[in-house]
Amino acid sequence: MKVRASVKKMCDKCRVIRRHGRVMVICENPKHKQRQG
């Protein structure tokens, strides 16, 4: 899980979602998981 100021899709499989007021990226590739913070 990467914590970043700006989250971006890193590939076509990445999905940008909102959970508990946080913007997150979920993906098949675990390296692409990101959370805004």
Curated annotation (Swiss-Prot):
Query: Which terms in the Gene Ontology molecular function aspect does this entry carry?
Result: structural constituent of ribosome
The UniProt entry, under SUPFAM superfamilies, shows: Ribosomal protein L36
The alphabetized list of GO BP terms reads:
translation
User: Which terms are listed as keywords in the entry?
Assistant: Ribonucleoprotein, Ribosomal protein
- Matching Pfam families: Ribosomal_L36
Q: InterPro entries given for it?
A: Ribosomal_bL36, Ribosomal_bL36_sp
Is this entry keyworded Nucleotidyltransferase?
Answer: no
What highest taxon heads this organism's lineage?
A: Bacteria
- A single Gene Ontology CC term: cytoplasm
Q: Which family does it belong to?
A: Belongs to the bacterial ribosomal protein bL36 family.
In terms of PANTHER family, this protein maps to: 50S RIBOSOMAL PROTEIN L36, CHLOROPLASTIC (PTHR42888), LARGE RIBOSOMAL SUBUNIT PROTEIN BL36C (PTHR42888:SF1)
Per its record, how is this protein called by name? Large ribosomal subunit protein bL36
Gene label: rpmJ
